[in-house]
Amino acid sequence: MKTSPLTLLLGAALTLSGASLQAAPADTARTAAWFEAHKDRPPLLRQFLQRMPKGADLHSHVSGAVYAESYLGWAAQADLCVDTVRKSIQGQSCGTGEGQVPASKLGSAAAAAMVDRMSMRNLDQAGRSGHDQFFDAFSVFGPVSDLPGKPAAMLAELSNRAAGQQILHLELMTTVQGGAVRRLGGQLAWAAEPDLARRHQWLLDHGLAALVEAGRHDLDALDQDYRQQQGCDSARPQPGCGVSVRWLQQTTRTNPPEQVYAQLAYAFELAKADRRVVGLNLVAPEDHPVALRDYRLQMEMIGFLSKQSPQVKIALHAGELVLGLVPPEHLRHHIRDAVELAGAHRIGHAVDIGFENDGFETMALMKQRGVAAEICLTSNDGILGVRGREHPLPDYLAAGVPVVLASDDEGISRIDLSHEYVRAASTYGLGYAQLKQFSRNSLEYSFLPGTSLWQDAAQARVVSACRRDVPGAAQPSPACAAWLQGSERAGRQWALEAAFERFEQSPQWRRPALRSRGRGL
């Protein structure tokens, strides 16, 4: 059977450099020392962290990760119209209305204004909050992201950018068969206290399986289109072909409850049927009136469906709120409910932990259950205005909660994942060891199938089958090689360790500190 380019190749971790890699604590110490000597210099810090292997980006929305310039280019190719008055992109060619200009004929000033409209660039001139600017951007580029062939082009942009930052794996949020599933859900009779089991069975009896098959065909088509665009089977594949990709099926939390339930049920069924879909998530503003009204109901929906399909992984946006954006009462329980009621394996953002009724206990529970916090520093600053000392990142670390850094919507925020590592290091004074742990955590808490390479990830202690091997070695022992072949996650973790060995052996980190003798430096 032909292997999908978007699935992890089990042997990828073993086809590395032919050079023998040896454990070298001295290399690690030397690299850490170079980092400490230069981390107060932003250009050098960026160069270091751009080169540093970063296992995965686990919290990324496909459409929001694409840069605005790409959308404008694709709009021009499709002869779409830009309304320069409303600053929107139309899903068709221009008519005779005021301010309508073909995307292919936009002047530099109009194009710059559209980039600002589709991103957080020049937010101080937008005349609106970061929250509104951010979430409204999706409606502007929506007509372009839906064009034929563009999902593959979007994925190509993301995977190639990831490869350029030494990222090995992406878990991307997308919506498959969204409209059809919502229409099916709209036929559900909904009551104040719904019988979730009965309604789940109704969905199964009325076409959910057929929509799952349609969704799998959509993924097949995307897979094929992406592979062709990237030349993944050619002699000169694009760099992104080496990045493994998995999908998280989205549910829009602002829809009516019957549609949300149908989308959630569909996400569970799709994840069971297709190994490319490794879990689910809820998206759209958590502060939306419907999302607030139905929050606990939605957690109960997920909890019920998870009991029917416990093998499906759950990542949830929870606690992406701040005092003033919503009344205090809505800050009291969202993270705890996501962990306890819904059974989330990862929590995205988790910003309002300080306002939770049982914040200390919730962090202890996350540590106990191994529920990772997906920290999106730039996004939290832009949308919520939470930054620096106000952000709970140091508190999660102090509480022993597993933490990963993520980009969220790098196109809208005008960043990349390396930027988030730079921001974490420069804002919180983190050392190389902690940043390396973030990188390892991103694969440890990924939803890739299989057991972990680590018996104890925090202590970098490998499983018994590989205990006599150097993690990342090009030729693992037979027992270790068999272990790696049996676990996609362990195979990717092995590849990350090999990348760290190469990174830490760079002669750059052996050189003296780069210090200018110039005045004031």
Model-assigned labels for residue ranges:
Residues 1-5:
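Positively charged n-region of N-terminal signal peptides that target proteins for export
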Residues 23-521:
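Metal-cofactor-binding active-site regions of metalloenzymes
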Residues 7-17:
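Bacterial N-terminal signal peptides
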